[in-house]
Amino acid sequence: MSAEVAAVEIQEAPVAAPIMYKVESNDGTVFEISDEAVKQSNTLSNLISTCAPEDVASMDPIPITNVTGNILKMVIEWCEKHKGEALPVDDDSVPKHITVPEWDTNFLKIDNEVLFDLIVACNYLDVPGLMNYGCKMVAMMAIGKSPDELRIIFAIPTDEEDEAAERAAKEKAEAEKKANAEKDAAEPSTSK
Amino acid sequence: MAENDGETIVPDEQCNLTASTPMKSSGLEQVESPKERKTSMVECDDEGNPSSGTPDESPKQLTPHSIPPRRRRSPRRPEVSASRLPLKVLNQIFQYLPLKDLRSAMLTCHSWNNALSMEDSDIWQYLLGKKLPEAAVSDPFLLAELGSAKKKLRAWYFAWNTSDISRNNYIRTNGFTVHRQPVAQSTDGVRGKRGISKGVHAFDITWDGPLGTVAVVGIATKHAALHCVGYVALLGSDDQSWGWNLVDNVLMHNGAQLGVYPKMNNPPKYEVGDKIRLIIDCDTHVAYFERNSEFLGIAFNHIPPLRLYPAVCAVYGNTEVTMVYVGSPQMG
């Protein structure tokens, strides 16, 4: 009887205690990600592949210096949701074809700027599953649109708008320079 | 008389010049419509992203997602935005787009145009592998002069038209070579898939197999006939086509001979297998030929501003003609 109880306890131990890794975003926020979820990111998998499991608890967080906290949080949330899944394998259809599951569709209903930040973070962290879904969502916005419509959807300025912005910035800089010059001219007369 | 020695069948003296094209007009119109839309793509490529290429904006709903407001952003801040995505990311997004949408993407902004202008990137390699027949991809000589996947893909869209061809011709599995079957007392032609009406365009044409008594290369509108009874220089026999008969080096248009071409004494005869480059300059309304990269002089001028297709007509059984579009020729 006591032997059976001991056996059960031993069997339950691995399931109850996943290894949690700590990662830190560029604004200092620390997140935890499980060892199964880490496998969705090739970059993170390579970083932890040489760490002994018993040393994980005392390690400093892994610094991710070019991803912000809210984006890193989303990536980790996605990885936790899809932990245990195989990494996607590209088929060779043209145009490329992929079906985005419903959960991921809702997950990616975010502001376009956040979506682009998320895609760039996936590119750096090498999360192919989320990368495919994110790029697919962007492509679906673009299908069937004219160039003018694409500029509106993705907030892309035209060359004329770019020139106008540069001209405004230049005028602003010149105005500041002029104000500083006047200020410098005023001071010598005061000292005199 | 000497010209007939090579013929197993003596041609009749009477010719039926009024033979109509076997294509139905409704079929032609259907074929024409998608070409109209695709032509602007190549014209944009040739002209280097002209501003006039922007299509009209439609009032339909733009996107199921909310459109972010167009906030002015300082040009100095390196924020991530659609126009500043890394190249690798852009390529992944573009892999989901069909060809027509890739054209819209090329016209949207500079960075997208730069990404899609890399003519051997994965996107064009994918499309090339899927669109071109295996026989064309594996032929080491057919498209050798085209240096990039995108150019080869473009040549495919200009190749001989399998649905705008005489019934006695068929197009081989490589998609670029037309084969004339051995049918007596028949002249048989073929047109390219896409016509041109702006810019400067070059087509490399190679005649393999004997010429017979008629072997004409030239240009035609979509109304020019592609078949008639007898052995006739059909291309150039009316006001819808212009042709150069390689057998006697004579230029033809509207049924009239315009003289020998190249304009010299005893111009050399065409050697079977030589490459002829047909160049159509729609902006100055002239057409001319080069042979093995040698300029031969202006062939046709005062060409009306119509949509023109490369075309050939042949009479010899089992002769073959290959046509590859090469885009704008390099001047100088």
Curated annotation (Swiss-Prot), chain B:
Disruption phenotype: Synaptic defects that include both overdevelopment and underdevelopment of presynaptic and postsynaptic termini. Abnormal morphology of cholinergic and GABAergic neuromuscular junctions (NMJs) characterized by uneven distribution of presynaptic markers snb-1 and unc-17 and post-synaptic markers GABA receptor unc-49 and AChR unc-38. Also, formation of abnormally large and small synapses. Frequency of spontaneous miniature synaptic release (mPSC) from cholinergic and GABAergic NMJs is reduced. The keyword Chaperone does not apply. Gene3D superfamilies: 1.20.1280.50, 2.60.120.920. Keywords: Synapse, Ubl conjugation pathway. GO terms for molecular function: protease binding. Pathway: Protein modification; protein ubiquitination. Pfam families: F-box (PF00646), SPRY (PF00622). GO terms for biological process: dauer larval development; determination of adult lifespan; negative regulation of apoptotic process; negative regulation of axon extension; negative regulation of axon regeneration; negative regulation of DNA damage response, signal transduction by p53 class mediator; negative regulation of gene expression; positive regulation of neuromuscular synaptic transmission. Residues 15-28, 49-64 have a biased composition (Polar residues). GO terms for cellular component: neuromuscular junction; neuron projection; presynapse; SCF ubiquitin ligase complex; synapse. Residues 138-330 form the B30.2/SPRY domain. Its main location: other. InterPro entries: B30.2/SPRY (IPR001870), B30.2/SPRY_sf (IPR043136), ConA-like_dom_sf (IPR013320), F-box-like_dom_sf (IPR036047), F-box_dom (IPR001810), FBXO45-Fsn/SPSB_families (IPR050672), SPRY_dom (IPR003877), SPRY_FBXO45 (IPR035784). Expressed in GABAergic neuromuscular junctions (NMJs). Residues 79-127 form the F-box domain. Residues 1-82 are annotated as: Disordered. SUPFAM superfamilies: Concanavalin A-like lectins/glucanases (SSF49899), F-box domain (SSF81383). It is found in: Synapse. It comes from the Eukaryota. Belongs to the FBXO45/Fsn family. PANTHER family: F-BOX_SPRY DOMAIN-CONTAINING PROTEIN 1, SPRY DOMAIN CONTAINING SOCS BOX PROTEIN. Component of an SCF (SKP1-CUL1-F-box protein) E3 ubiquitin ligase complex composed of cul-1, fsn-1, rpm-1 and skr-1. Interacts (via SPRY domain) with scd-2 (via cytoplasmic domain). Interacts (via SPRY domain) with convertase egl-3 (via C-terminus). Component of a SCF (SKP1-CUL1-F-box protein) E3 ubiquitin ligase complex which is required for the restriction and/or maturation of synapses in GABAergic neuromuscular junction (NMJ) presynaptic neurons. Promotes NRJ synapse development and synaptic transmission by negatively regulating the daf-2/InsR pathway in muscles. By targeting convertase egl-3 for degradation, negatively modulates insulin-like protein ins-4 and ins-6 processing. May stabilize synapse formation by promoting the down-regulation of scd-2. Regulates axon termination in PLM and ALM neurons. This is F-box/SPRY domain-containing protein 1. It comes from Caenorhabditis elegans. The lineage of its organism: Eukaryota, Metazoa, Ecdysozoa, Nematoda, Chromadorea.
